[in-house]
């Protein structure tokens, strides 16, 4: 199993460059938005939300990558693997390290651009950029792409395209109702443990379904 994990990590290592655009694209979006707010002299308190928005975008992009890896690479590599657990663990670790790398790059870029912005707009303190993000949110965001990938790939394996479409419409519904659940989470960040716990339980089911996936 250890050999399979190491082999999988080495095989996927060339794809680590994908963490760069996954991190920098949201940072650029946030930077443009911040400059527009500064130029129009709107309420600087709006800047408090921007890093959170950028982090969400980065995590969403990493979730997409996690789904792609577990839905496409897992069935492909399963044909050459004697250890399903090792293969699944290797892909999950690869997704995790890519997400952590993207978060680090995004955090460094945001701080660097925040320092530059502070030079031009002194009333926007750099420290305010991180006031709205609790510390425990970062590790939660790091594991989200792994959990989402396991759920999505597991549902596709167990229920086929029908299950995938159901998840897709549930995701769309969640995005359109963001105004109803984002404010409670922003006011009480600890409540994030409930949806994450439910997602983790579904991810366990997804992993079990992947363990029973047929070799194509």
Regions found by a protein language model. Give the residues of each.
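Hydrophobic alpha-helical transmembrane segments of membrane proteins
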Residues: 1-75, 85-216
């Amino acid at each position: 199993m250890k050999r399979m994990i190491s082999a999988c990590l080495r095989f996927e290592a060339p794809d680590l460059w994908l963490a760069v655009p996954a991190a920098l694209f949201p940072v650029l979006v946030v930077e443009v938005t911040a400059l527009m707010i500064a130029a129009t002299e709107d309420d600087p308190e709006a800047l408090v939300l921007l890093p959170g928005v950028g982090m969400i975008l980065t995590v969403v992009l990493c979730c997409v990558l996690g789904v792609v890896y577990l839905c496409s690479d897992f069935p492909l590599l399963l044909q050459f693997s004697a250890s399903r657990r090792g293969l699944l663990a290797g892909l999950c670790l690869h997704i995790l390290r890519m997400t952590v790398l993207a978060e680090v790059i995004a955090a460094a870029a945001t701080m660097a651009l925040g320092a530059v912005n502070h030079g031009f707009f002194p009333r926007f303190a750099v420290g305010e950029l991180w006031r709205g993000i609790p510390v425990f949110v970062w590790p939660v965001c790091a594991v989200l792409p792994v959990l989402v990938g396991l759920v999505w790939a597991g549902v596709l394996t167990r229920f086929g395209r029908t299950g995938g479409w159901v998840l897709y419409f549930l995701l769309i519904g969640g995005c359109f109702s963001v105004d109803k659940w984002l404010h409670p989470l922003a006011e009480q960040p600890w409540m994030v443990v409930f949806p994450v716990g439910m997602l983790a339980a579904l991810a366990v089911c997804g992993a079990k379904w992947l363990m029973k996936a047929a070799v194509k």
